[in-house]
């Protein structure tokens, strides 16, 4: 199996071909045997779980930014909502970022930032913290699995990340992370178990991988504004590492029919908004590939009783910023690029975007239908993105390129990254559909 490198080099990897994530400069890949994979069975009903959701995560946003303060009990919230009518329900803001790709150099930097004792990833992603904490809902993509508490910790090609990453991400303001990726099975069930245990301990919701059939049937369920948000997560493959026959639920694979079924189960159980996180695409290609486009069209075209099944698609995996596009009236982020990563042969591997969307509730009262036949449909009224760059020298540091540019800072490398990201994001007409770059 070939490794994944920027051009020039081996041919780029495409969705549907089992591949390894991009290697940092100087990395030497190790091989694995390709084995066929079959996916798990149907999703488990979520009504009881969704009915009990009254807050997001551990509620740490309360008092911090006003986004979720004062929800009260579920009964009180329901009564208040019934009194004021659906037309007065609060909307919510969503913030999402790309791959947390923890190469060896990232591990060393986290060790140094912790003073040589433990690992601290917080300084590296500090530039995302104000935006993540300001949003009502912040979502990350946890591409790599975690190693044992005491290590050893490794980067490419079989990742085992220090579990302290979960705490750093939570402290930065994130609520939930997708975990379905081509590296989910780098250490089989043990790696999945360690990763989800650490995320549970940090108070981070997670979806995309699971420790049991029952857990696989549950999306990440989050409260944002007055909405119940269901997050789903799937990957194109697992680098040829087979799912154990007795544990087919370890990771979710991209199968459009299954994604639609899962979304409908979440809808019937009360989810107002369904977000699908998809690990897909051709590495180092800014344009979405054929499978990305076809899956996006199928998912966004799917309707139940006149209501769309998927409200937003957030893509990862390509390691470069990809286009944003409205497909069948639904926003699709084909690829957000990397949020953190070691130095790549291709400088675009250090570039990424943060997706920023604001959802508003339907204007009709519960059960009423609008003129187009939809019912209870939340919609995006503001769409934006923020360009970021991971500076790799003299230390790994995430930089908000739009903020730097607005205050006249930056350098030629940052200016080039800013323009590269802008062109990629707007390459499929998103600007005409209202997408804006935000600091």
Q: Where are each of the predicted segments found?
A:
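Acidic, metal/ion-coordinating pockets
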Residues: 2-9, 13, 57-439
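C-terminal motif of bacterial Sec signal peptides marking the signal peptidase cleavage site
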Residues: 52-55
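Hydrophobic alpha-helical targeting segments used for export or membrane insertion
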Residues: 44-50, 275
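N-terminal export and membrane-targeting signals
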Residues: 13-45
């Amino acid at each position: 199996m070939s490794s994944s490198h920027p051009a020039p080099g081996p041919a780029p990897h495409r969705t549907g071909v089992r591949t390894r994530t991009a290697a940092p400069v100087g990395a030497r890949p190790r091989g694995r045997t390709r084995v066929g994979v079959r996916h798990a069975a149907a999703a488990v009903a979520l009504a009881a779980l969704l009915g009990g959701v009254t807050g997001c995560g551990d509620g740490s946003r309360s008092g911090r930014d006003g986004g979720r303060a004062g929800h009260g009990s579920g009964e009180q919230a329901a009564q208040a909502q019934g009194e004021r009518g659906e037309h007065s329900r609060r909307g919510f803001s969503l913030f999402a970022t790309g791959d947390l790709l923890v190469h060896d150099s990232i591990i060393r930097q986290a060790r140094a930032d912790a003073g040589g004792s433990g690992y601290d990833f917080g300084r590296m992603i500090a530039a995302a913290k104000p935006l993540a904490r300001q949003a009502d809902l912040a979502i990350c993509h946890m591409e790599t699995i975690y190693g044992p508490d005491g290590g050893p910790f490794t980067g490419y090609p079989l990742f085992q990340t220090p579990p302290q990453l979960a705490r750093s991400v939570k402290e930065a303001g994130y609520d939930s992370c997708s975990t379905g990726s081509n590296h989910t099975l780098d250490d089989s069930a043990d790696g999945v178990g360690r990763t989800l245990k650490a995320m549970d301990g940090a108070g981070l919701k997670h979806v995309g991988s699971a420790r049991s059939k029952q857990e696989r049937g549950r999306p990440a369920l989050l409260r944002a504004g007055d909405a119940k948000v269901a997050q789903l997560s799937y990957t194109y493959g697992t680098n040829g590492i087979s799912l154990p026959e007795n544990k087919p639920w370890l990771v979710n694979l991209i199968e459009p029919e299954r994604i639609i079924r899962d979304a409908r189960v979440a809808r019937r159980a009360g989810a107002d908004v369904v977000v699908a996180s998809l690990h897909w695409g051709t590495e180092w290609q800014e344009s979405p590939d054929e499978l990305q486009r076809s899956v996006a069209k199928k998912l966004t075209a799917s309707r139940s009783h006149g209501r769309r099944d998927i409200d937003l698609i957030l893509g990862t995996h390509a390691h470069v910023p990809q286009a944003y596009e409205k497909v069948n009236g639904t926003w699709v982020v084909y690829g957000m690029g990397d949020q953190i990563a070691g130095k790549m042969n291709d400088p675009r591997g250090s570039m990424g975007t943060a997706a920023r969307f604001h959802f508003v509730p339907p204007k009709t009262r519960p059960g009423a239908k609008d003129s187009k036949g939809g019912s209870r449909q939340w919609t995006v009224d503001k769409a934006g993105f923020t360009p970021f760059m991971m500076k790799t020298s003299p230390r790994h540091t995430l930089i908000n390129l739009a903020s730097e540019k607005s205050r006249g800072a930056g350098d030629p490398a940052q200016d080039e990254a800013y323009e590269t990201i802008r062109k990629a994001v707007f390459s499929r007409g998103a600007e005409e559909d209202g997408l804006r770059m935000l600091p």
